[in-house]
């Protein structure tokens, strides 16, 4: 059986890891052993934060809706209850966008909600 020399595959593997570590500071970007650890850790952070991002954006949308609703005399929970009673099925992302960029449209939704809550 011939002897297997791994120069080509090792070089390719090193190049791949160092390419992923491009832009890292210090030896994390140019020493394979350290770059490999840094790339692994970066992947763990990326995996974790793709899930965290969903929670963070939901919190942001709720905070924006709450602030806009309070300006018009309702709390977030009252507003959410009124939306359900009025059968308005707009998600939080769209409501937050309306609250920030189209105050008139958000105001009309709040008026519909207030009417349903009063009835």
UniProtKB/Swiss-Prot annotation:
Origin superkingdom: Bacteria
Keywords (alphabetical) are: Ribonucleoprotein, Ribosomal protein, RNA-binding, rRNA-binding
What molecular functions are annotated in GO for this chain? rRNA binding; structural constituent of ribosome
> What transmembrane ranges does the database entry give?
none
Instruction: Tell me the GO BP annotations in alphabetical order.
Output: ribosomal large subunit assembly; translation
Question: PROSITE patterns given for it?
Answer: RIBOSOMAL_L20
In terms of InterPro entries, this protein maps to:
Ribosomal_bL20, RIBOSOMAL_L20_CS, Ribosomal_protein_bL20_C
GO CC annotations on file: ribonucleoprotein complex; ribosome
Q: Which family does it belong to?
A: Belongs to the bacterial ribosomal protein bL20 family.
Q: Which function does this protein serve?
A: Binds directly to 23S ribosomal RNA and is necessary for the in vitro assembly process of the 50S ribosomal subunit. It is not involved in the protein synthesizing functions of that subunit.
* Entry protein name: Large ribosomal subunit protein bL20
């Amino acid at each position: 059986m011939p002897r297997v020399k791994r120069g080509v595959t090792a070089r390719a593997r090193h190049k791949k890891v160092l390419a992923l570590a491009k832009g890292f500071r210090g030896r994390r970007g140019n020493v394979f052993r350290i770059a490999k650890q840094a790339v692994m850790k970066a992947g763990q952070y990326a995996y974790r934060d793709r899930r965290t991002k969903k929670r963070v954006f939901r919190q942001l949308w709720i905070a924006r809706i709450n602030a806009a609703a309070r300006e018009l005399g309702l709390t977030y929970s009252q507003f959410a209850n009124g939306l359900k009673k009025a059968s308005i099925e707009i998600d939080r992302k769209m409501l937050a966008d309306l609250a920030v960029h189209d105050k008139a449209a958000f105001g009309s939704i709040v008026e519909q909600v207030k009417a349903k809550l009063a009835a």
